[in-house]
């Protein structure tokens, strides 16, 4: 595993340890990587978090997956503790699993927009979560939906969208989410300039929670594309879609309260953030002897494609990625997998919880990337986003 990725994983592990213990080690000399807590301490946290198999998971498979994680995690943590960044592929993948399960960068399931107070990862983030709940994070979560084809569900969908204008029925998502709906599910669309009429069936479900059988579906009928649109770093990866109610649709939820193009959110001046979306099953299959995608699915109960909240920090300013020639992407380290594309980055501890960027991709342990509203306000305003 490449050393830059390992350095970032080590920093995340150290951040989680510092949050649990003020006496945890700080940065190594030269700021190359952060020293994690002693291996045993971190593994104790992981073991506690994974003490009971999730429902509907084969217990034998779960225990085997847990043992693989703990074995490779121990070896990797011992190396990092002594400053050795030469992790093999399985040790590196185990570190990625650890930062999710030990609370360093968790991905919290939501139920009625709330985090389960018994979630084993909640302790590290309890203060922030309490503050976010007081600011109305549950109401904001209600505006986030799963974009899916006809008969869509947690294993059959394309990404995340968020309601930004209830009166006009507008949601914001990525251009590449719309593109994948066409390519992966054959959703027919007709182009007319910078707009797409959705001739096939594409919808958004504003529930999509693991605890609920309810749906809150609206049909996506038209998509507006910004000038210079493109996927990931190859253009402005954004789209504003218009939705219409179905015969059984309830009233739309309240939209997100504020889209912000404040430059402070693109420079790291305000660093704490969170996103709400629908992460899919991870594809961590680059281990040498272990299928880490299988391990992650078993350990976390296959609860993917459902609504989650992931907290994190700002990591990189505009133009940091070599492909970001337009200087429009910022970096963050919240835990995301495919399916979270189209999620809004929120300053979740600020008054009115402003949303300031649109997540479009990345990799756990390196960086995730999001389209900065400060960089592309004019292009987004032209297709219906209000700042």
UniProtKB/Swiss-Prot annotation:
Top-rank lineage group of the source organism: Bacteria
Biological process according to GO: defense response to virus; proteolysis
Residue pairs linked by disulfide bridges in the UniProt entry: none
Assigned keywords, A-Z: Antiviral defense, Hydrolase, Protease, Serine protease
Cross-referenced InterPro entries: Peptidase_S1_PA, Peptidase_S1_PA_chymotrypsin
EC number of this enzyme: 3.4.21.-
Effect noted on mutating residue 343 to A: 4-gene operon still protects against phage
Annotated signal peptide: none
Family according to the record: Belongs to the peptidase S1 family.
Record-given protein name: Probable serine protease FE772_23060
Organism: Lysobacter enzymogenes
